[in-house]
Amino acid sequence: MMQDVSSSPVSPADDSLSNSEEEPDRQQPQSGKRGGRKRRSSRRSAGGGAGPGGAAGGGVGGGDEPGSPAQGKRGKKSAGCGGGGGSAGGGGGSSSGGGSPQSYEELQTQRVMANVRGRQRTQSLNEAFAALRKIIPTLPSDKLSKIQTLKLAARYIDFLYQVLQSDELDSKMASCSYVAHERLSYAFSVWRMEGAWSMSASH
C-alpha cells in the first residue's frame, strides 16, 4: 500500500494547488521589496527636493561670504567711499582751520577799536572837567576829584542864583564882567570857607 501511494503519480490538480500556494509566498517578498523601493524612492525624492533648496541656500550663503568676489567688490567700494569721506572731513578741517585765524583777527580788531573809543571818551571827559575847573572858583589847596568837582559846580550854580536874587551888585559892577567875576569868585571862596560848602556838600 505504501508503495502504491508513493509511486502513484501526482495529479495536475494537486500540482496547481501547490503552485498557487507558493505564488503568494513569492509575491509577498516581492511586494515587500517593491514597498522598500517605493519608500527609498520617496526618500530620495524628498532628499532631492531638499538638495536644491540647500544648494540655493548655499548659493545665497556663498554670496554673503566675505571671501566671495561680489563681497570683495562691495568691500572695495565701501572702502573707496570711506576714503572719500575722510578726504571730505580733511577738507572741512582745513576750511575750519582757515576760518579760525580770521575770527581771531576780527576779535583783535574789535578789541583795538573798543580801546580806542574808550581812550577817546576818557580824553574828552578830562578836557570837560578841566574846562569846568577853570570856570569854578577854586582854592590853591583844592585837589578835587571828578565827583567833588561836579558837586562844587552845583554849589557854585546855587550861589550864583542867590547872588542874582539879591541887590548887592549895582549896575556898574554888573556892567564889568571881569570885576563881577572877581567879586563872585571871592564871595564864593568866602562862602566855602564859612562852612556853607561843607554843609551843602553833606546833603
UniProtKB/Swiss-Prot annotation:
Residues 1-105 are annotated as: Disordered. Residues 1-18 have a biased composition (Low complexity). The keyword DNA-binding applies. Residues 109-160 form the bHLH domain. Signal peptide: none annotated. GO terms for cellular component: nucleus. Residues 34-43 have a biased composition (Basic residues). Residues 46-65, 80-100 have a biased composition (Gly residues). Gene3D superfamilies: Helix-loop-helix DNA-binding domain. Residues 162-192 are annotated as: Sufficient for transactivation activity. GO terms for molecular function: DNA-binding transcription factor activity, RNA polymerase II-specific; protein dimerization activity; RNA polymerase II transcription regulatory region sequence-specific DNA binding. Keywords: Activator, Biological rhythms, Developmental protein, Differentiation, DNA-binding, Myogenesis, Nucleus, Repressor, Transcription, Transcription regulation. It is found in: Nucleus. GO terms for biological process: cell differentiation; muscle organ development; negative regulation of DNA-templated transcription; rhythmic process. Efficient DNA binding requires dimerization with another bHLH protein. Homodimer or heterodimer with E proteins such as TCF3. ID1 binds preferentially to TCF3 but does not interact efficiently with TWIST1 so ID1 levels control the amount of TCF3 available to dimerize with TWIST and thus determine the type of dimer formed. Acts as a transcriptional regulator. Inhibits myogenesis by sequestrating E proteins, inhibiting trans-activation by MEF2, and inhibiting DNA-binding by MYOD1 through physical interaction. This interaction probably involves the basic domains of both proteins. Also represses expression of pro-inflammatory cytokines such as TNFA and IL1B. Regulates cranial suture patterning and fusion. Activates transcription as a heterodimer with E proteins. Regulates gene expression differentially, depending on dimer composition. This is Twist-related protein 1. It comes from Callithrix jacchus.
